[in-house]
Amino acid sequence: MSTIDKEAVKLYLMQLQDQICQRLEQEDGKATFIEDAWHREPGDRLGGGGRTRVMRNGNVFEQGGVNFSHVQGNAMPASATAHRPELAGRRFEAMGVSLVMHPHNPYVPTSHANVRFFIAEKEGEAPIWWFGGGFDLTPFYPFEEDCQFWHNTAKEVCAPFGADVYAQHKAWCDDYFYLPHRGETRGIGGLFFDDLNQWEFDKCFDYIKAVGEGYCDAYLPIVERRKVTEYGEREREFQLYRRGRYVEFNLVYDRGTLFGLQSGGRTESILMSMPPLARWEYSYEPQADSPEASLYQHYLKPREW
């Protein structure tokens, strides 16, 4: 059985943050990430620290953030113990990299990725640990070839870890990034997994490395293809309207957002995923046979790619 190595995970996650920021800056060609390093002393709630990095007003990206955090607490919040009651009364550590990129151009999809590690410990008992993460894509004006490329890259990431891993984590992603009150998925999905500890520690760790590094391989070629596509006010207005769904999901359903807010996490870092602008419109209906209608008809429901 492989040894649990928290320090190795932390070091890797910090390197992954550096690597992803570098590649996104290269793709943007103008903006750089501004780092806000933070630290909290342990107290009644979360202690720890992190590096919040935000990019604004680039050539390609209107706003985006790539966060690293490593926090500790004496008791898990309700959002975590609700489905894992055995965690009650254990001190815990949580560390991860989380990112969201909101592009200017409506033809470039919004993207999200996350890899994380949790460990909950109690004197005299075996630790409870798991990994989680994934990446998902939210296009406004989807192209079939882009969606297939995204999912084919996800399949390649999963292939070394088992024949059924992609299918399982793709289905989990479709289920997780779903807005019941809207009856639609947030986007076209990708990969999502949580509570990953059924393999040995080293294999689980290798999998989150593959997912973390696979994100840029899946996303940047799509950005490169679409970032110079011409668009007008109509496309921009629709992009802002659809960003509203992103806000709704993150504030109502997202487990990471709820965990962070309920456990007293750093609010500015938690809400970094919010788009800089979004809009809502009462009783919006896309025009029949329009590109906007195509999004609803063909892409906001689970599909096999």
From Swiss-Prot:
Catalytic residues (positions): H112 (proton donor)
Main location as per UniProt: cytoplasm
Example GO BP: protoporphyrinogen IX biosynthetic process
Region (Important for dimerization): 246-281
Annotated GO CC locations: cytoplasm
Catalytic activity: coproporphyrinogen III + O2 + 2 H(+) = protoporphyrinogen IX + 2 CO2 + 2 H2O
EC nos: 1.3.3.3
Pathways per UniProt: Porphyrin-containing compound metabolism; protoporphyrin-IX biosynthesis; protoporphyrinogen-IX from coproporphyrinogen-III (O2 route): step 1/1
Record-listed substrate binding positions: S98, N114, V115, R116, G264, G265, R266
PROSITE patterns cross-referenced by the UniProt entry: COPROGEN_OXIDASE (PS01021)
One GO MF term attached to the UniProt entry: metal ion binding
Keywords assigned: Cytoplasm, Heme biosynthesis, Metal-binding, Oxidoreductase, Porphyrin biosynthesis
Function: Involved in the heme biosynthesis. Catalyzes the aerobic oxidative decarboxylation of propionate groups of rings A and B of coproporphyrinogen-III to yield the vinyl groups in protoporphyrinogen-IX.
Similarity comment: family membership: Belongs to the aerobic coproporphyrinogen-III oxidase family.
Oligomer status and interactors: Homodimer.
Name of the protein in question: Oxygen-dependent coproporphyrinogen-III oxidase
Organism: Vibrio vulnificus (strain YJ016)
Lineage: Bacteria, Pseudomonadati, Pseudomonadota, Gammaproteobacteria, Vibrionales
Gene encoding the protein: hemF
